[in-house]
Each structure stands twice: as C-alpha cells, then as structure tokens.
Regions:
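C-terminal domain-boundary segment and adjacent tail
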Residues: 2-10, 40, 115, 147-156, ...
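A short acidic, amphipathic alpha-helical/loop segment
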Residues: 7, 31-35, 135-139, 215, ...
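Metal-dependent polysaccharide deacetylase catalytic core of the NodB/CE4 family, i.e.
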Residues: 37-146, 153-170, 196-204
Length: 285
C-alpha cells in the first residue's frame, strides 16, 4: 500500500489561495470592489435581500456610512466579474433564536429572491451576527446551502473542517493582519503539506466609520499580483476543494480518475500532478 500522502493543490498547481467576504450590501461596497478589481482580488458579498431600500430613497445627510443599496444598484455591483453574491438570511436575524420553520423561511426567501434577482444559483452564505447553532446548520443543509462563514478568527491558513462552520483567518481590523499578510506573501507550504487559504472578512462601512480605508488599500497592494496565489471567491474555493475530494484513486494509489468537469492538481511525494476532466492518469511515485 502507498505510504506517501496526497495533498490538494489549487488551480495551476498553486499552493496558496486568497478570498474575501463582506456583509450587508452597503454603498461602501462600491469603493471596496473598485479596490479589489484594480488589484485582481476576488470575493463574496453577503446580502439580506429584505434590507434593500426603495428606488429613489435618499438618506439624510448626517448618515455617513452603512447606507443600504437599492436592488438595482446591488444588481449592477454584485454582477461584476470576480464577485460572488451569497445569502446573509432574508432579514438579518439571530437565526439561533428562531424555530426551524422560521430559519427555513429566512434561508429559502433569501435564496429565492437572490436567484431571481441575479438569474443564477446561490448556495453560499455568511451567518448574520456570526451566530448559529446545530439546528441552524441542519436547516441550512436541508435548504441546499453548501457553506456558511462565521466570524471566529483562526489566525491560520487552514481550509475549513466543516463548510457550514467556515471560520475565516481574520477580520480586516485584526492586529495580526500585517504579520499574517507578510507570512502569506513571503512563505509557502512545503510539497508535503496542505495548501494555504487566507480568508479576510468584514463590512465595508467600517472603513468609513473607523476612517481606515488605508487598511484594505495597503493589504491589496501587498497581496495582489502574485503568481503563486489563486485569487478566488468563496464558492470557487468550495467547488474546487469538493472536486478534489471526488477524485477516485486505485487501491494502491497508482492511478487516479477525475469524474469532475474541472482539472484538479495534487502532490504526492515530490511530484505535482494534474488530471483533466474525465481523465485517468498513472501516479508514478
């Protein structure tokens, strides 16, 4: 039997990936997405679709941050390339305080409205307030949600152990962000280690409230344009990882078959392999 472990690699054989996640569909997302797009970064924006404001509504001038969007502006913004739209529950409640039927309504109504708005399939989510319990997770699973982000910082680059408890690396104001960024840019996992995922989250209105747009601007400057980093949305991370897990290996791990529609990369020993959709290849070490 084989003794060497097999480790996933991201598209192109890369060992590092970066994803961002921002909540609440606020006007400050326009500036954030402009920064992301200019630097080639990708991310996921989590929307409570009940909270859109009516077309033509004007906020009072003293409202400086946290302004909600109209549906029309949200459709324009979150349809841009490199941006995923995901659920944040329909009315942004504390889901763990609700009955099973109320939780299901929040998820189904949010998913139904976003899928109608954007004309696609929406299966990702971030928990409103970051709170949940086992019953919330069960209902999410039954409603077809495949991942949901929490607010619990890991301060690590580990992939999630449970997709419906997807803990991020850190919030953008975490004091560890600079050292984590430096480590992620300058170092990399060894060939016999799991790949790294750097996951940063927040709310774009915080950049105005806290007067710290420089945090995300500096972060984008430092981490963008690296040919050894895969820049991806949350769903792209989930889909690729799940496709890797669908690879079929012979008992002695001398052959591998890829039943998915995506080319998958992995290492074994000191070798990097890629297996195309529908292909079976030998593993020589």
């Amino acid at each position: 039997m084989a003794t060497q472990s097999i480790y996933m690699r991201f598209p192109g054989g890369l060992s590092k990936a970066l994803t961002l996640s921002y909540d609440d569909a606020v006007e400050q997302d326009f500036r954030l997405i402009d920064i992301m797009t200019a630097h080639g970064l990708k991310g996921t924006f989590n929307i409570s679709s009940y909270q859109y404001i009516p077309e033509g509504y004007v906020y009072p001038p003293e409202k400086k941050w946290g302004q909600r969007m109209t549906m029309e502006r949200a459709t324009e913004l979150y349809s841009r390339d490199g941006i995923e739209h995901a659920l944040h529950a329909y009315t942004h409640p504390h889901l763990e305080t609700m009955s099973s039927s109320q939780i299901a309504y929040e998820i189904i109504k949010n998913r139904e409205s976003l899928e109608a708005q954007f004309g696609d399939i929406v299966r990702g989510m971030a928990y409103p307030y970051g709170t949940y319990n086992d019953e919330v997770i069960r209902v999410l699973h039954d409603c077809g949600i495949v991942y949901s982000r929490t607010v619990k910082a890991t301060l690590s680059f580990d992939l999630p152990g449970e997709w419906l408890k997807w803990h991020p690396t850190c919030h953008h104001t975490d004091p560890h962000l600079p050292e984590l960024t430096a480590k992620f840019v300058e170092k990399f996992p060894k060939v016999d280690q799991h790949p790294w995922l750097f996951y940063v989250w927040g709310h774009a209105y915080e950049f105005v409230r806290d007067d710290n747009w420089h945090i995300i601007e500096n972060f984008a400057d430092q981490i963008s344009g690296k040919d050894d980093i895969w820049y991806a949305t949350n769903m792209e991370i989930w889909e690729y990882t799940e496709n890797f897990r669908r690879l079929v290996f012979s008992l002695d791990e001398s052959r591998v078959y890829n039943p998915t529609a995506q080319t998958i990369y992995f290492t074994k020993g000191n070798m990097l392999y890629s297996v195309a959709p529908g292909q079976t290849i030998p593993i020589t070490n």
